[in-house]
Amino acid sequence: MISNGIGTVTTGKRSMCLFPLLLIGLWGCVTCHRSPVEDICTAKPRDIPVNPMCIYRSPEKKATEGEGSEQKIPGATNRRVWELSKANSHFATAFYQHLADSKNNNDNIFLSPLSISTAFAMTKLGACNNTLKQLMEVFKFDTISEKTSDQIHFFFAKLNCRLYRKANKSSELVSANRLFGDKSITFNETYQDISEVVYGAKLQPLDFKGNAEQSRLTINQWISNKTEGRITDVIPPQAIDEFTVLVLVNTIYFKGLWKSKFSPENTKKELFYKADGESCSVPMMYQEGKFRYRRVAEGTQVLELPFKGDDITMVLILPKLEKPLAKVERELTPDMLQEWLDELTETLLVVHMPHFRIEDSFSVKEQLQDMGLEDLFSPEKSRLPGIVAEGRNDLYVSDAFHKAFLEVNEEGSEAAASTVISIAGRSLNLNRVTFQANRPFLVLIREVALNTIIFMGRVANPCVN
């Protein structure tokens, strides 16, 4: 008998709880093993013997029309790291569309696709057979030129180094991974070593069998500490029980200051028009200045607001009045998004943007199953022999929880050099383009050089805290 966050299943198999977050929960280990690698960011592939129990080789795919016009890879960037970032963007848009389809058009949405992808990449370390194949396909890891699944982990380490070890500290972007394993279980040493070296996921033994509720509280407290208290109570009651073997958690925290701040004196109450035709009053921020902007297909406006340091930006996608945001969501593709971003040019703008705070919490299980990740969640079909020492095939993921938070105000964003242009009053805006986000819009927070989508969401009702 195992209980998960959704229901109860009768089976002889053991469960792993998966908690993406901004977080995720999965596996575990009992003893910690030191690796000779001193710094993963300067290591070479030969320095990190990634030898999981199973390796999947992606089949060769025929070139399709249009291939060969690839973007120029940024300088000093590993090609495979660039491809991994693109794979994450493909997964982000696909997962977002599945999630949006399951929600009401008036619901806010916010998530970190990078957090979800990272946590399931860690799961992939112990996967075999069709379970491994589905993980490679659903998360688009099979699009990376390096065709063997074991090398993905090395490229994830390099991607994390690019994102989280920046010399510029004007924005705060922090990620943390942790394994919480049942203290009675002995876990595969290779799995432990790779998890710690590549993902920085150290083991903390807990007593799931003897005190499941205290274990749940301990994990939730760790998550809260790593997100500055912004993410709490991710794991719901009864999600962990005596059948839980391991929980893997990934957290991402971002806090950034606008490169060009909004003056609080310019913030006024204005109406925001929701998808159902109703309106509500919201503090609307305002400023005039030069920003990267483009009006694209069917009048959709795309605006990029940089944070200090210019390496991380917020992208807003605002449909014209006559076009529902749901239509933009359904039509959006990774290539379309990349094309829009490439076309942005510096434009003198009048920006109206709501002051808002949104929080979202959901299970990712149903969406991932719809995308083809079925075996991992099946007690009968799951194959995760590379996690425990004895190579058992009785483990599966019972559920996967995700919780994310975003706050945007005059100073910047919390989720995260040129002259500041701020007008102390509202002018007549002659010869200026107006970007007025007084209706539902999409929001992305991305790392610019690699175009890595860190966060993604929909602001449908900023009046709800």
From Swiss-Prot:
Chief site of localization: secreted
Superkingdom of origin organism: Eukaryota
Alphabetized InterPro entries for the sequence: Antithrombin_3_serpin_domain (IPR033829), Serpin_CS (IPR023795), Serpin_dom (IPR023796), Serpin_fam (IPR000215), Serpin_sf (IPR036186), Serpin_sf_1 (IPR042178), Serpin_sf_2 (IPR042185)
Sequence positions bearing Phosphoserine: 69
This protein's UniProt keywords: Blood coagulation, Disulfide bond, Glycoprotein, Hemostasis, Heparin-binding, Phosphoprotein, Protease inhibitor, Secreted, Serine protease inhibitor, Signal
Residues glycosylated per entry: 129, 168, 188, 225
Post-translational modification: Phosphorylated by FAM20C in the extracellular medium.
Known tissue expression: Plasma.
GO biological process, alphabetically ordered: blood coagulation; regulation of blood coagulation
Binding site for heparin: 82, 162, 178
MF terms (GO), sorted A to Z: heparin binding; serine-type endopeptidase inhibitor activity
Function, in words: Most important serine protease inhibitor in plasma that regulates the blood coagulation cascade. AT-III inhibits thrombin, matriptase-3/TMPRSS7, as well as factors IXa, Xa and XIa. Its inhibitory activity is greatly enhanced in the presence of heparin.
Family of the protein in this entry: Belongs to the serpin family.
Quaternary structure note: Forms protease inhibiting heterodimer with TMPRSS7.
Entry protein name: Antithrombin-III
Species of the source: Ovis aries (Sheep)
Gene behind the chain: SERPINC1
